[in-house]
């Protein structure tokens, strides 16, 4: 089940739907959850038997996502925002094949890499999820296939305006003990530059990160992770990762590091 939530998305809704409908694997459904668009985007929305539209008022993107989850019938859920795309037309086919070859005994998450349209680079995800990965940088939400039951058991918390998906991921790792498997492929093309990346919301994001990590991680664990971040010049690395000029170099080095770890 692919969930797309929207409110006055303009032409971006159909861009995302076209990317989904182009998939060579036909076994999917699309849940479009609209919060009351008035820009004509719903009237001009693509029509397909696999697209299901639900219109209901909501107070935030995370409340809209929770509403959408109640309508899914698939075993796994992927969230795509309007403007985000599948990286190529084979993503679902390759993911389905991987899931068949690597089944999970428990409800878990399959995740992959992400192409950043903003910096024109591929963002590599770690081949193994650890506590430090949870503290530092989890895989992009648009590149994670969640077992639907994980989203039903633990709805997104609307009190977090920026990081409710991050809080949910940490719940999956620390509380649900959900298995997580790396797909080894690029799942989504992430548009970036949206609501969460404004100057004001970056400050809110940092505050929410502090609250959420304290909720799931022990003080000793937090101290260790913060020390590592300080010693490895985290602000400089972040600036490089977000720079269109240096992002490719940084992500290339990251990919090589992850590759060596995977080989071990």
Task: Describe each model-derived feature in a short phrase.
Residues 85, 89-122:
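Conserved donor NDP-sugar-binding/catalytic core segment of glycosyltransferases
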Residues 77:
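Short aromatic/hydrophobic "clamp" motif used to bind/position activated sugar donors
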Residues 26, 34-42, 81:
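A conserved acidic beta->alpha catalytic loop
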Residues 18-27:
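Short, acidic, metal-binding catalytic loop of nucleotide-sugar glycosyltransferases
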Residues 122-208, 212:
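Conserved nucleotide-sugar donor-binding catalytic segment
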Residues 1, 29, 167:
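Cell-envelope/extracellular polymer assembly enzymes that use nucleotide-activated donors
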Residues 55-72:
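Glycine-rich, basic loop-to-helix element that forms the pyrophosphate-binding segment
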Residues 11-14, 39-47:
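Acidic helix N-cap motif at the loop->helix transition within catalytic regions
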């Amino acid at each position: 089940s692919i969930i797309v939530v929207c409110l006055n998305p303009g032409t971006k809704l159909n861009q995302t739907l076209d990317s989904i409908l182009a998939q060579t694997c036909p076994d999917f459904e699309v849940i479009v959850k609209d919060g009351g668009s008035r820009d004509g985007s719903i009237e001009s929305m693509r029509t397909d038997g696999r697209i299901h539209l639900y219109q209901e008022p909501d107070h935030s993107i995370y409340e809209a996502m929770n509403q959408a989850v109640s309508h899914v019938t698939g075993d796994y859920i992927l969230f795509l925002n309007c403007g985000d795309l599948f990286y190529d037309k084979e993503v679902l086919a390759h993911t389905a094949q991987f899931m068949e070859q690597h089944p999970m005994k428990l409800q878990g998450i399959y995740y992959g890499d992400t192409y950043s349209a903003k910096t024109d680079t591929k963002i590599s995800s770690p081949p193994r999820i650890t506590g430090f990965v949870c503290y530092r940088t989890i895989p992009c939400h648009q590149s994670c296939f969640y077992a639907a039951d994980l989203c039903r058991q633990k709805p997104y918390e609307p009190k977090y305006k920026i990081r409710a998906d991050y809080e949910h991921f940490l719940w999956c790792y620390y509380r649900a003990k959900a298995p997580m498997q790396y797909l080894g492929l690029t799942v989504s093309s992430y548009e970036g530059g949206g609501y969460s990346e404004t100057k004001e919301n970056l400050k809110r994001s940092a505050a929410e990160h502090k609250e959420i990590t304290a909720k799931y991680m022990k003080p000793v664990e937090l101290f260790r992770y913060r020390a590592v971040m300080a010693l490895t010049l985290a602000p400089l690395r972040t600036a490089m990762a977000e720079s269109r000029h240096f992002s490719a170099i940084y992500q290339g080095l990251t990919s090589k590091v992850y590759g060596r770890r995977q080989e071990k």
